[in-house]
């Protein structure tokens, strides 16, 4: 789901999502990170 991390590129979300979900799968959606 969405996490409270601002972004411009999906790769900016990989590390934050890995910390939250343990998965590096992420996308930047509407300038906010979404983890899968």
UniProtKB/Swiss-Prot annotation:
GO terms for molecular function: ion channel inhibitor activity; potassium channel regulator activity; toxin activity. It is found in: Secreted. The keyword Disulfide bond applies. Disulfide bonds join 7-28, 13-33, 17-35. The record marks 36 as: Aromatic residue of the functional dyad. Expressed by the venom gland. GO terms for cellular component: extracellular region. Its main location: secreted. InterPro entries: Scorpion_toxin-like_sf, Scorpion_toxinS_K_inh. Keywords: Calcium-activated potassium channel impairing toxin, Disulfide bond, Ion channel impairing toxin, Neurotoxin, Potassium channel impairing toxin, Secreted, Toxin. Gene3D superfamilies: Knottin, scorpion toxin-like. Has the structural arrangement of an alpha-helix connected to a beta-sheet by disulfide bonds (CSalpha/beta). Belongs to the short scorpion toxin superfamily. Potassium channel inhibitor family. Alpha-KTx 16 subfamily. Poorly competes with (125)I-kaliotoxin binding on rat brain synaptosome (IC(50)>100 nM). Is a poor Kv1.3/KCNA3 ligand. May have as real target KCa1.1/KCNMA1 channel. Shows weak toxicity on mice. This is Potassium channel toxin alpha-KTx 16.9.
